[in-house]
Amino acid sequence: MGFFITFEGIEGCGKTTQLRLLKERLEAAGEKVTVTREPGGCPVADQMRAILLDAKNSAITPLAELLLYAAARAQHVQEVIVPALERGETVLCDRFTDATVAYQGHGRGLDLTVIEELNTLATGRVQPALTVLIDCPVEVGLSRALARIEATSGAKEERFERESLLFHQKVRNGYLTLAAAFPERFVVVDGSGDVRQTGLLVAEALRQRMQSLGKAGLAAVKAGC
């Protein structure tokens, strides 16, 4: 079996950039890597992503939102993640089940027990071995995210970025609560600095965690920046 790593964080935290940098280091070292994301990651789930992230769809209810995420995840796990792990690849996923707990649970206030049950059903109990939480103040993350959106041509995925500061603070608190509850799986990295600063912190955090997991080869790959 392969090794499953997820990257999590609030809007604009820099997780997508750090995931890409890790992919490049792994591939340069000869590792086989599958990079994917949620919502989306495959054609069926990408159609649901378009609905979920389009600001024009502000009428989506919290429950409908939750169920769309679960449906997209069920397809994504079976079509992309499980096959890649069975091929022995390292899977890097931009958001996974923790995002649903943070956004729909802590942010929207939906029942956490229901979310846990849906996540278990959608994933077939597939869970990451390691989750990298890129944490930064809400104001910093939103400033970056909105600047990125304004610079983007074509369809803008901005429904969550347009939520209130209070919503995003609840999401951040939800992530930090998860990290405290599952310290054996989470590493928390300060993402308030620039890309290089954050990258160095990610590399060192991964090196230490991989060594503790007995993944010496992967630890050596991830230490470079």
UniProtKB/Swiss-Prot annotation:
InterPro entries linked to this entry: P-loop_NTPase, Thymidylate_kin-like_dom, Thymidylate_kinase
Keyword vocabulary terms for this entry: ATP-binding, Kinase, Nucleotide biosynthesis, Nucleotide-binding, Transferase
UniProt superkingdom: Bacteria
Any one Gene Ontology molecular-function term assigned to this protein's record: ATP binding
The EC number(s) this enzyme carries: 2.7.4.9
Reactions it catalyzes: dTMP + ATP = dTDP + ADP
Cellular component GO terms, alphabetical: cytosol
GO biological process: dTDP biosynthetic process; dTTP biosynthetic process; dUDP biosynthetic process
CDD domains reported for this sequence: TMPK (cd01672)
Binding site for ATP: G9, I10, E11, G12, C13, G14, K15, T16
Listed Gene3D superfamilies: P-loop containing nucleotide triphosphate hydrolases
Listed PANTHER family: THYMIDYLATE KINASE (PTHR10344), UMP-CMP KINASE 2, MITOCHONDRIAL (PTHR10344:SF4)
Family membership: Belongs to the thymidylate kinase family.
HAMAP family in the cross-refs: Thymidylate_kinase
Function summary: Phosphorylation of dTMP to form dTDP in both de novo and salvage pathways of dTTP synthesis.
Protein name, per record: Thymidylate kinase
Gene: tmk
